[in-house]
């Protein structure tokens, strides 16, 4: 028996295929820069140093996007350090974390990216990581070793540790 297709069925099939193509090979990096720099008021230099290390240890593709969140007090120095990123600002307890989580869900990153890299060890992101993984997104966490929450670690399949280079002894 042949099942009749409606316009809605054809549209849903087309958009579903389109979403898969849109996701293919793309990643988004959600960066809680305060957590990565270990400072609530990171300087432009501190952000640049952390990002140099980040780029050295984290695979970044040509189609990758970056979303960076900070509190309002750090907006200018962080904004100077970054170019071509989506910069979010929210103050208060977990303000930057909330801004990143809301952006991920609101912008439907589960449908737009194959891979999400969470640049933070904060346990606040455990629920987001769980949701993304349930949606079929590969989730990686990038964190300082001592800043990685056990709860967040339990929700992801991959962790990359940011370790500052050991100073050369002369």
Q: Language model features by range: what are they?
A:
Residues 72-170:
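Nuclease catalytic cores that cleave nucleic-acid phosphodiester bonds
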């Amino acid at each position: 028996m042949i099942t009749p297709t409606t316009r809605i069925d054809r549209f849903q099939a087309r958009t579903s295929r389109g979403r898969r193509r849109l996701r293919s090979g793309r990643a988004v990096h959600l960066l809680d820069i305060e957590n990565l720099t270990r400072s609530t008021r990171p300087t432009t230099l501190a952000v640049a140093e952390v990002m140099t290390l980040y780029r050295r240890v984290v695979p970044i593709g040509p189609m990758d996007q970056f979303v960076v969140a900070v509190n309002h007090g750090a907006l200018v120095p962080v904004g100077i350090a970054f170019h071509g990123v989506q910069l979010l600002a929210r103050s208060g307890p977990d303000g930057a974390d909330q801004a990143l989580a809301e952006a991920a869900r609101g912008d439907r990153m589960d449908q737009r990216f194959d891979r999400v890299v969470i640049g933070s060890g904060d346990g606040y992101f455990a629920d987001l990581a769980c949701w993304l993984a349930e949606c079929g997104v590969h989730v990686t966490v990038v964190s300082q070793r001592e800043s990685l929450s056990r709860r967040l670690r339990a929700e992801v399949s991959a962790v990359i540790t940011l370790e500052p280079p050991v100073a050369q002894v002369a």
